[in-house]
Amino acid sequence: HAGVLAMTFSEALGSGIVRHPTVACFLARTWDFLIGVGIDSTRIRFRQHASTEMAHYADDCWDCELHGEYGWVECVGIANRTCHDLLSHEQHSGSKLLRAWRQFDEPRSEARDVLAPNGASLGPTFKDRAGDVMEALQNLTEIPESMPFELTLADGSTARITDDMVTRRSEEVTLHGEWFTPHVIEPAFGIDRIIWHILDHCYTETQKKGENYSIMRLNQSVAPFDVAILPLFDKDGMDDIARQIWASVNSMPGLRGELDANKSIGRRYARVDEIGIPWAITVDHTTLEDGSVTVRRRDDQEQVRASIEDVLSKLASDSISTLF
């Protein structure tokens, strides 16, 4: 057991800890996904399965564990199943139809043993199937060690090949591609566990004016709304401007705005913070005078004023944070 090591995925692959580049890619993509939905990067680790606990079909297996109130919990599993499933099917069915063809960028030449068809014997034996048998013989990538053997044809049927039907010889062949059995990387995500840890990592509780004050610092990508639009009062034209802003936000692809005009502005800010909306736009008396609004940032409650046009533009370009 190597213990806990801190390194990049590239370093883990280069040192042989991660055994296949595709597995390293899946580990890195899992990391990116978890960070993107708001998981704390300091509370993520990847644990490699020991050979004694690995599934019989796996060549390498990793768990992504997240740390929360209940300690380290497995939330993602990534297994390199290699070609176990397809190869097992091929061995038991005798069919090679589950192989895939890989075309080379440039033709390659190599010396190999081949079984040259003997038409004088194949023709009378297989009659109208003789052409299919010859094609299958020419496409053989593994020469059998002994005769007779069962040859699988393109349609999945088989033909029994005996010594008199072929001549074994070595020749220079030009290869334009190769057949291979695809490998499978199997990721499994525990969505409920991930969601629980998002909430666990993002929830904070402080004191404000002698009362508990909750803030859910959700990443904007998973927040219930991108922005809350709050008229200071639901009258005097502030409500109309707020509804116009709300309609503009909800017309933008990928953005959702929440309009809230109920209770005091302080109570509404608290509701916005509690459910994790990252931004709040407040329409007040100054808005009626110069068309500017207050933009409030959830995580530190900082506020700035900007024109409605500027705020909408920065929301659309995902750059509203540049106002601060």
Residue ranges with predicted function:
Residues 1-324:
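NTP/phosphate- and nucleic-acid-binding module
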